[in-house]
Amino acid sequence: MTGGDALPAIQHDDRLDHILLSRRSTKQFTDSPLSLAEIAHALWTVAGTTTAGHRVGASARATYPIATTLVAGEIDGLAMGAYLYHPVEHTLVITRSGDQRPAVAEASLDAASWLPGCPAAILLSADVAAARERFPDQPAVHGERFVWIEVGLAAQNAYLWAAERGVGTVLLAGLDDERATGSCRGLIPHRHELLGILPLGEPAQSAS
């Protein structure tokens, strides 16, 4: 489609513009560890609370169905394992110790070769069945739709944080649901489905 009224040229003279211009998807990482402070900030950016008691991401009727799980690999000051992030308290509660990155990689369709080498990953999950019943005044599909929208909002927050900090990430949503159910059992909350994986680490080379 062509034609129409021309808009003013974008000047790209503010901080958000520069962050958006540097946003990339990264699938190759170095083995450099991340700091616990970096991980804390990443988790807050994805799912944290603000000083007004709200969250950093919007949620339909403030239901906040998305759970955030950290899979820690090479993080200075934090043992390998899976940790559930509690945003109100800004704390981590371990769900399984040891290196869980290979198990998470099994859930992906095309990241099994490189995901186990990422220093960390954030898992986004939700009880989708419960979400379908959460809005009785609307069709059940709306509850599930809201969940997916909120996954996108959380992922975009992660992208913006990563772009500002020079950290690499990518949203992995191409998942094998059956394998994910088995490999992530005990890592994410009971009855939750894995909806997205956000690897985190130092980019090894230019991303797209």
What kind of feature is each model-predicted range?
Residues 73-75, 127, 203:
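Solvent-exposed coil/turn segments that connect beta secondary-structure elements
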Residues 60, 169-172, 190:
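Short, surface-exposed helix-loop/turn micro-motifs enriched in polar/charged residues
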Residues 42, 68, 120-133, 139-182:
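Small-aliphatic-rich amphipathic alpha-helix that forms the alpha element of a beta-alpha
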Residues 183-190:
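Short proline/glycine-enriched turn/loop segments at secondary-structure junctions
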Residues 29, 79, 132-133, 207-208:
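Short helix/loop capping segments that flank catalytic or ligand/cofactor-binding pockets
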Residues 97, 193-208:
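C-terminal helix-cap and adjacent tail motif
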Residues 1-118:
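N-terminal amphipathic, basic helical "cap/leader" segment at the start of enzyme domains
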